[in-house]
Amino acid sequence: MDGFIIINKKENMTSRDVVNIVCKKLHTKKVGHTGTLDPMAKGVLVIAVNKALKLVDDITSLNKEYIAEVTLGIKTDTLDITGNVLEKEDITNINKEFIEEVLNSFIGEYNMEVPIYSAVKVNGKKLYEYAREGKSVELPIKKVVINNIELLSVDQ
């Protein structure tokens, strides 16, 4: 079989877990994906099988859409909800208009330092492995383009 499989990845699974399952089910080792989703993330994971692997770079260069849930006023050591809370801040006077203004400031093209808790590899090793070992490493810079951003709802 050659082609793509669209999988709705569940929470608490790595993208690699999904690839391994597909490898076993299809009895092939030529399986990959078009982009890692964090283990706590759920959503579409595009799986490429055999000859379709040649098209992965073309697909990863396309625009993507994300829906994210954000908790304001908390900073963690992993930059996500799974980490240890380092700081808490009172956000009672932050309103919807302010949040929309901040979100809109992200629209455009810019360079972003890749977070240390990331599957991006440096010297053949995933950044989150360096972070878990307490080792510092020069973080790569990635070009980011945000064409549109929309606030769907605010819960108090």
Q: What are these model-derived regions, one by one?
A:
Residues 1-156:
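Catalytic/RNA-binding core of pseudouridine synthases
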